[in-house]
Amino acid sequence: MSPRPEIKAGVGFKAGVKDYRLTYYTPDYQTKDTDILAAFRMTPQPGVPAEECGAAVAAESSTGTWTTVWTDGLTSLDRYKGRCYAIEPVAGEENQYIAYVAYPLDLFEEGSVTNLFTSIVGNVFGFKALRALRLEDLRIPPAYSKTFQGPPHGIQVERDKLNKYGRPLLGCTIKPKLGLSAKNYGRAVYECLRGGLDFTKDDENVNSQPFMRWRDRFLFCAEAIYKSQGETGEIKGHYLNATAGTCEEMIKRAQFARELGMPIVMHDYLTGGFTANTSLAHYCRDNGLLLHIHRAMHAVLDRQKNHGMHFRVLAKALRLSGGDHIHSGTVVGKLEGERQVTLGFVDLLRDDYIEKDRSRGIYFTQDWVSLPGVLPVASGGIHVWHMPALTEIFGDDSVLQFGGGTLGHPWGNAPGAVANRVALEACVQARNEGRDLAREGNEIIREAAKWSPELAAACEVWKEIKFEFDTVDTL
């Protein structure tokens, strides 16, 4: 029997485990214009250095693994690895740090939010050396954003399609969200649109349930839209929720909406998934449909201050994946949203170029180049008394959506819509005349209520309604 040959390790390979920071913590690194940059809020386990944690985040979300492997020598890790290039303590928080990580562009598939998130917010969030990890912000370079279609149409094209300018758009979510028959649902849509709203909306829960199948809902809503358009002379729409159990079924529903001549469909982009959402966005551009996006499930990901990801990251991801509207909080209503933070990601949705501004939670300057903008939708616990503040906070390029604030009117749905339209027109006129909506808002609403009995009734019903809780999402 011949002697067993001696196997020698290669010169460049040394088996074993080594600290991540030896390879992935590079404080001298100069970021490139093509790098994707990430800001992570880290809470290390006791005794683990911040530099090791930051390097671990960079490693585990790019080329690293827990031990040295032979195949490291078959590629250029220096070209492909993520790099933790800066770490700073979080003011006022014990044992929390912001780690800045740069990723080379070649790590990510073009035009795929799914692939981007699989790397950056993947397994690393379960890493044992970290007690908690939150992705606060991403810088998407133009070299990557140009590989995405983005929103199907964008703000200006939507205004041109609707022939509506110089004011926020008005919407209403049909309530109760579940349980109505298709015919009664269509009746509520008609009454709201006839009263002066621009849009009505399927609730995010409404897909195709036994009490109301999707095709029946689409047909009765189409009838309501055509009837209200004929009576008002305005273009109307209803967000027909195309979200379904499969991508094929989702596209089938969008096709039916197009065949009915409807202007807009809707998708729950987080529960539906980014691959489905991007597919629907491409279909909508090709077929002239606007796309309304609901963010159901977002608070599971973004509500905790030290773990998960901030909504500004989800907002940027949506702009890449595609959507013409997205729910963004209200600042003044029943749902979470601190003013400066909300306005920060609203600008990230709408504007082409947004400067770094840590006072608004914006960690990086973001240049979207020519990617179309997204209209923020303020929705949740708002009513006519909020109209001056909403108009002042969100400006013209927004959708103000009153569900209970329309359908809860004591005289019915159409008077509720009238009250909201009158309040909005009064606020826009007052603003255009140079009045201060923040200071004179209540007076402006009272003046308008003198000649609108519908608005006067709404003011009386909701005069005591407030949602006074401290926001969790603070800087």
Swiss-Prot record:
Predominant location: plastid
Residues of the active site: K175, H294
Prosegment residue ranges: 1-2
Similarity field: Belongs to the RuBisCO large chain family. Type I subfamily.
Function: RuBisCO catalyzes two reactions: the carboxylation of D-ribulose 1,5-bisphosphate, the primary event in carbon dioxide fixation, as well as the oxidative fragmentation of the pentose substrate in the photorespiration process. Both reactions occur simultaneously and in competition at the same active site.
A cellular-component GO term for this protein: chloroplast
Coiled coil: none
GO BP, one annotated term: photorespiration
Other comment: The basic functional RuBisCO is composed of a large chain homodimer in a 'head-to-tail' conformation. In form I RuBisCO this homodimer is arranged in a barrel-like tetramer with the small subunits forming a tetrameric 'cap' on each end of the 'barrel'.
Gene that this sequence comes from: rbcL
Residue numbers carrying N6-carboxylysine: K201
Record InterPro entries: RuBisCO (IPR033966), RuBisCo_large_chain_AS (IPR020878), RuBisCO_lsu_C (IPR000685), RuBisCO_lsu_C_sf (IPR036376), RuBisCO_lsu_fd_N (IPR017443), RuBisCO_lsu_N_sf (IPR036422), RuBisCO_lsuI (IPR020888)
Keywords: Acetylation, Calvin cycle, Carbon dioxide fixation, Chloroplast, Disulfide bond, Lyase, Magnesium, Metal-binding, Methylation, Monooxygenase, Oxidoreductase, Photorespiration, Photosynthesis, Plastid
Site annotation Transition state stabilizer: residues: K334
Amino-acid positions noted as binding substrate in the UniProt annotation, renumbered to this chain: N123, T173, K177, R295, H327, S379
SUPFAM superfamilies: RuBisCo, C-terminal domain, RuBisCO, large subunit, small (N-terminal) domain
N-acetylproline: residues carrying this PTM: P3
Taxonomic superkingdom: Eukaryota
Cofactor note: Binds 1 Mg(2+) ion per subunit.
Single GO MF descriptor: ribulose-bisphosphate carboxylase activity
Protein name: Ribulose bisphosphate carboxylase large chain
